[in-house]
Amino acid sequence: MQLTSDQLTESKPVHPLDLGSLRAALQALANALDIVSSPEFSAVDLRWRDTLVAGVVQHFESTFELCWKMLKRQLEREVPSPSELDGPSYRELFRLGYQRGLIPAVEPWFEFRELRNITAHTYSREKADKVAAGAHALLAAAKALLSAIESRNHV
């Protein structure tokens, strides 16, 4: 069977990315940050504070992971050859996201990756506090990324 030129250039319909998990992660991180940023937080028992900060760290990690996965999925839709994205490091992925206008700068994302890595293997209150301090910046950057992806998916 011979294909016509129209059939060769037809592409499958592209459905919008399902961004529900990223939206949920952003909301969970925002909720956790609201709690640990509240005036009442300092009056809470130390055990509760440690547990709540650990929750912020967990939400930071899951939000970061979802961000780079959604960034990769969006880039797979945009680059001429999606197989180009099979091997690049996370740094190259964020650079491509910057070049494509999905993120305004790469440096914050490199910092978020470092923060995510410091809690991956060992845990300490100091490390948790450091990650929690960076969570506000991640929340803002992740919201901007979500907005950029939504605009390209007509959501």
Regions found by a protein language model. Give the residues of each.
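Solvent-exposed interaction patches of small proteins and small membrane subunits
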Residues: M1-V155
